[in-house]
């Protein structure tokens, strides 16, 4: 076991078995290679899975994850995966434009850029388009300052944002270990969580 499995897969699997919640419309922010979209579509076969990522011509999309030299193959492989199930809808969209979205979602998975200001904006926008009793999950949450911070991969931004929102009683959140192996958890600066949050509707 490499320790690189993520507990978000277990969380999604558990939610798919829930008798108390219905997840008709699901939004994924950050498509990446499409495998998580495929997982969601298999776990929630009767749901609509909307997944968004930057346009393939966007400089950040091209340069993230060192994929610049293999960008065409990356896109081709991703699109093949996304085409496997009919309930997956891919949109090349900068998540900032969710500000103008009208559609509401039961479940939102935030896995785009992890630093300021983008993840903060993603969280606020997601709260605006969340249905009552809906859930938002955020990936790669550091609760202490990571060894290095950047706007894309590693940042304390998610934790700081949701902590302020909870302090004002706008949301409630819980943290779940992202990985369970000792290597990823013994060093607090490497330890990551998945945040599960719900909005307090007044």
Sequence positions of predicted segments:
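A short alpha-helical cap/connector motif
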Residues: 1-109, 113-202
């Amino acid at each position: 076991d490499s320790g690189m499995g993520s507990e978000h897969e277990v969380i999604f699997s558990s939610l798919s078995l829930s008798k108390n919640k219905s997840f008709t419309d699901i939004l994924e922010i950050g498509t990446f290679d499409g495998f998580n979209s495929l997982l969601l579509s298999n776990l929630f076969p009767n749901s609509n899975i909307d997944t968004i990522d930057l346009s393939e011509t966007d400089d950040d999309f091209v340069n993230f994850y060192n994929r610049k030299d293999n960008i065409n193959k990356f896109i081709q492989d991703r699109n093949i995966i996304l085409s496997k199930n009919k309930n997956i809808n891919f949109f090349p969209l900068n998540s900032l434009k969710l500000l103008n979205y009208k559609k509401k979602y039961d479940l939102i998975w935030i896995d785009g850029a992890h630093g300021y200001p983008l993840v903060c904006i993603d969280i606020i926008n997601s709260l605006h388009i969340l249905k009552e009793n809906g859930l938002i999950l955020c990936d790669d949450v550091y609760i202490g300052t990571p060894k290095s911070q950047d706007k894309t991969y590693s940042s304390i931004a998610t934790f700081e944002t949701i902590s302020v929102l909870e302090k004002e009683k706008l949301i409630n959140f819980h943290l779940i270990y992202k990985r369970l192996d000792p290597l990823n958890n013994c060093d607090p600066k490497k330890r990551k969580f998945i945040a599960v949050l719900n909005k307090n509707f007044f």
